Amino acid sequence: MSRYRGPRFKKIRRLGALPGLTSKRPRAGSDLRNQSRSGKRSQYRIRLEEKQKLRFHYGLTERQLLKYVRIAGKAKGSTGQVLLQLLEMRLDNILFRLGMASTIPGARQLVNHRHILVNGRIVDIPSYRCKPRDIITAKDEQKSRALIQNYLDSSPHEELPKHLTLHSFQYKGLVNQIIDSKWVGLKINELLVVEYYSRQT
C-alpha cells in the first residue's frame, strides 16, 4: 500500500489531529459527531483507527509500519513504547519536531532533496535513525537555509521535547537522548496498534 497523498482534512476529521500530516485541526466535536453517526465502534475498528492514525501521522506505507512493528517486537521492553521511539527518532520526524519543517512530508522533501546534513554528511534517507549526540544541520547553501528559515519563522513556538535542542540561528539541531514516551507528538494508544498487527498474523 502506498503512502497517503489524498485530502488531509478528510483524514483528520475521521482520526483527529495528525500534526505530522497537517497543521490543520478538526473542528471541535466533529469526531464525536462522526462516532455518533456510525454508532458503537467495533474493537477491530478502534484498533484499525489507532493504526491508521500512526501511519498517517508519520507518513508511512503499510509495509513500512509493519516492518517497524516487527523490529519493535524483537527488541527488549514494551513493543508499543519501542515502536514509538523508532518512529520518533526517524530523521524526517526529528526535523519536524525541531520546527525545521512544518510537516513530516515537508521534512521528507528536505531530506530527499539533499538539504540536510547529519554530523557533517549529507543524508538523503528520511527514515535514517537518529542517535543521541547526532548533530543535524542545513546544508551551507542559501537555498537550503532559506527553506528552513521559512519553516522556522512560520512554525508555532511550542516547547521542544526534552530529547532535542535547537540552535535556530545556526540552523542546527541536537539529539540529546532517545525520546521519552511522554514527549511523543501524537495522542495514541500504541498498544492497540500492536494488538491490531498481532491479530493479523
From Swiss-Prot:
Domain S4 RNA-binding: 89-149
GO cellular component, as recorded: chloroplast; small ribosomal subunit
Keywords: Chloroplast, Plastid, Ribonucleoprotein, Ribosomal protein, RNA-binding, rRNA-binding
Listed GO MF terms: rRNA binding; structural constituent of ribosome
CDD domains per UniProt: S4
GO biological process: ribosomal small subunit biogenesis; translation
Family to which this protein belongs: Belongs to the universal ribosomal protein uS4 family.
NCBIfam families linked: PRK05327.1, rpsD_bact
Protein name in the entry: Small ribosomal subunit protein uS4c
Organism field: Buxus microphylla
